[in-house]
Amino acid sequence: MKIAVLPGDGIGTEIVAEAVKVLNALDLKLEMETALVGGAAYEAFGHPLPDATLKLAKEADAVLFGAVGDWKYDKLDRPLRPEQAILGLRKNLGLFANFRPAICYEQLVDASSLKPELIAGLDILIIRELTGDIYFGQPRGRRTATDGHFPGAEEAFDTMRYSRPEIERIAHVAFQAARKRSKRVTSVDKANVLETFQFWRDVLTEVGQQYPDVELDHMYVDNAAMQLVRAPKKFDVVVTGNLFGDILSDEAAMLTGSIGMLPSASLNASSQGLYEPSHGSAPDIAGKGVANPLATILSAAMMLRFSLNQEVAAQRIEAAVKDVLVQGLRTADIFSTGTTRVSTVEMGAAVVKALK
């Protein structure tokens, strides 16, 4: 089982190091090779995704990714910015399905900004289509307007589009995931305004007929955003497009009290995947030893489950994370009165010790 380890920038190196320690403690036959990506790769090779890094990722069974980005690269040409590395990996590996779980651990209920009764026991899985929608639709650009409200004015434009195969494959992923949970799927769209998402709704409904044991309901994105705050536990599996998924998954993440707790997975058709924490590179706290490694450690658990077929090992990691929370150990982002504040390295060591 070959893993490409890409720590990246900022706190990425710190949190990935702890996840690697946890993986090494499992006594599995894992072959892990590390490479530069993002700003670190730009500094060394002049590009955020060097050919050698991409080759390593393509040949691996899975990629364990930290985070990329730093304010000092914001003035670079867009293709050279660190964030382009993750887009390049998604494209070259064909990663079309993004899994973003939002789980509220019992010990962290008070960390949420919502009332405890609203989020206690929360367990949502947001499945976001990653390769289509307005982020990648063509044409796009800037031009002089020839019509609209202000002909002759400078304007910018993007294209929202989805093909039937793109929608069908993400729909199957969602229904199959729901079968392993509570057999409920909520498809989020804007079918009342956008032709693209009326088509999305039609195709989801058609695919849903192949899964008579799974309940499907549709919800407009504005209502979904509201219901995530009003009654989040009404959701189980949520499937949506790239743009809406980008927004809703971050909203759901904050329901739990800390984005530092939330893993993510991006998979292709052959279950090769890229696994990363939901948070960014946080250059403001890099090197201070205060970053929360649990999202990355839980991402490693997802990697074992979805790409490496190691369910027992995945459960061991998840149980160990719960154990350290029960012990009252907290990094700065989830620290509260009555708990014990620990560093990044100390939290990683505690998870290793808690493995059973």
From Swiss-Prot:
EC numbers for this chain? 1.1.1.85
According to UniProt, the reaction catalysed is: (2R,3S)-3-isopropylmalate + NAD(+) = 4-methyl-2-oxopentanoate + CO2 + NADH
Cofactor requirements of the protein: Mg(2+); Mn(2+)
Q: What does the entry list as the binding residues for Mg(2+)?
A: D222, D246, D250
Q: Which InterPro entries does this UniProt record tie to the protein?
A: IsoCit/isopropylmalate_DH_CS (IPR019818), IsoPropMal-DH-like_dom (IPR024084), Isopropylmalate_DH (IPR004429)
What EC class is this? Answer: oxidoreductase
Where found, per UniProt? Answer: Cytoplasm
Q: What does this protein do?
A: Catalyzes the oxidation of 3-carboxy-2-hydroxy-4-methylpentanoate (3-isopropylmalate) to 3-carboxy-4-methyl-2-oxopentanoate. The product decarboxylates to 4-methyl-2 oxopentanoate.
The name this protein goes by in its record: 3-isopropylmalate dehydrogenase
**Species whose genome carries this gene:** Albidiferax ferrireducens (strain ATCC BAA-621 / DSM 15236 / T118)
* GN (gene name): leuB
